[in-house]
Amino acid sequence: MGEVKSDIEIARAARKQPIMEVGAKLGIPPEHLLPYGHDKAKVSAEFIAAQNEKRNGRLILVTAINPTPAGEGKTTTTVGLGDGLNRIGKKAIVCIREASLGPCFGIKGGAAGGGYAQVVPMEDINLHFTGDFHAITSAHNLLSALIDNHIYWGNEQAIDIRRIAWRRVMDMNDRALRQIVGSLGGVANGYPRETGFDITVASEVMAILCLAMDIKDLEKRLGNIIIGYRRDKSPVFARDIKADGAMAVLLKDAMQPNLVQTLENNPAFVHGGPFANIAHGCNSVVATTTALKLADYVVTEAGFGADLGAEKFFDIKCRKAGLTPDAAVIVATVRAIKMNGGVKREDLGRESVEAVRKGCANLGRHIQNVKKFGVPVLVAINHFTSDTEAEVRAIKDYVRTLGSEAVLCKHWAEGSAGIEELAYKVVDLANAGHSQFSPLYPDEMPLFQKIETIAKDIYHASEVIADKLVREQLRTWEDQGYGDLPICMAKTQYSFSTDPNLRGAPTGHAVPIREVRLAAGAGFIVVITGEIMTMPGLPKVPSSERIRLNEQGYIEGLF
């Protein structure tokens, strides 16, 4: 076996087509592509608006089982499946999220796929790309600055500085900024108060950009952001301090989807990037709805496991955007299944069919959960060289007992040729008309009951633990007209429970609610459980230690 090339070496050797040629495959005229160099472009809002009357293609969701810290290749499989569909003669577009610098320099690496199933230019996508995250960070922090400025110049809106709900953000993992005191240094610097930073991907502005239908909807949602409360507990909105217009101006270009290509020169939209453990975990509605007008098949992903990303894709994104998924693919790896079967991380390379059989309970739970939404399921076994035939067979046999099918996929090593079988089966499943999509709960269900429904039906918890303050806050929001909003659970991605170390398919556990936040602009209620943080920290040995420029000026260590 020859030397295995790194992701960045493979991406750098790619024969990219000019982005205008990629756009032409979708019928996008050159004048409606706003190029950023030769290999990436934004699609104009005018072109997008003109596609409204076209019929939609088929929508395929790629999700996963509970992952290991390294991820299970969900983006890789999304990209590979898009290439596979194009390989068998179907017109397909991939829709994925943009990468955050936090995990890129932290533990998880980039978000452009891997091996021979990547989107390119990989280095750009994983770093600054077209500046969308900078624009989102700037718009968010403009609002933060305007809040403190409003208070400094007389506080006409009577904002209670003890009840300001808007923090600041940056696109980096930095635990030192979670809780800070601002405005120190004297009268000229304003009124000292406790505040803090979240990571940009947890920003409500990010969620708004990813859920807005167009620029008008974006500005309206920005105006609906609740920045804090008065002493009588009435909400103060971003529009009350006239912040929404300037924020929308900063986001004007960021609202337009980014067009790039796969290694096999197939089109891909990379747009938006909320995390699925602390936000709703899906790429933008604009990118997805545009892709559905331009292709016969759209393959999109939702972050982390199906308990987080898929649930939010169905209950938040599809509900709000009127989308109907035709099929779902759950990505599983032998190593993640073994980890869910109790194998330690350092022992994952050794064969253990028994651990696979035990860990399949986690996969089975995800299959059953996705089917609760009325969406038919296939399983993609993302192949690793350490997998054995017996382990793969055990997964296939187990999935068959649940009325679904598992397909071994080698797209990481072979590109589209390694995922042809899955592509054919996805086409058959999506066209069979089996999808009877319905969200998990109705809009009119009380907020706390919605939380209980997710906890009991998806996580298989026995109860939700919430103190009096949380329950009263939910009732207050219902009285204020927010009772019809969906729930966005903030929870560890490593387990069905709120304990990241509780693997497999646990039952009877409790879900403790630490805090609830109203994202009135995005249009959902964030429920923070367990120890989840909206500003992550870096690991002891961050990925950044391996990233450098070599003597030729090329980046090394990015993955």
Swiss-Prot record:
Chain sites annotated for binding ATP? 68-75
EC number, UniProt record = 6.3.4.3
User: InterPro entries, from UniProt?
Assistant: Formate_THF_ligase, Formate_THF_ligase_CS, P-loop_NTPase
Do you know which Pfam families this protein is assigned to? FTHFS
The source's domain of life comes to Bacteria
Keywords linked to the UniProt accession = ATP-binding, Ligase, Nucleotide-binding, One-carbon metabolism
Enzyme class of the recorded protein, top EC level: ligase
Query: What does the record list as GO biological process?
Result: tetrahydrofolate interconversion
What CDD domains does the entry give?
A: FTHFS
Name the pathway it acts in.
One-carbon metabolism; tetrahydrofolate interconversion
Supply one GO molecular-function term.
Answer: ATP binding
Spell out the reaction equation it catalyses.
(6S)-5,6,7,8-tetrahydrofolate + formate + ATP = (6R)-10-formyltetrahydrofolate + ADP + phosphate
> Does Protease show up as a keyword for this record?
no
Q: So what family is this one in?
A: Belongs to the formate--tetrahydrofolate ligase family.
UniProt cross-references to NCBIfam families, sorted A to Z: PRK13505.1
- The entry's protein name is Formate--tetrahydrofolate ligase
* Organism field: Rhizobium meliloti (strain 1021) (Ensifer meliloti)
Upper taxonomic classification of the species?
A: Bacteria, Pseudomonadati, Pseudomonadota, Alphaproteobacteria, Hyphomicrobiales
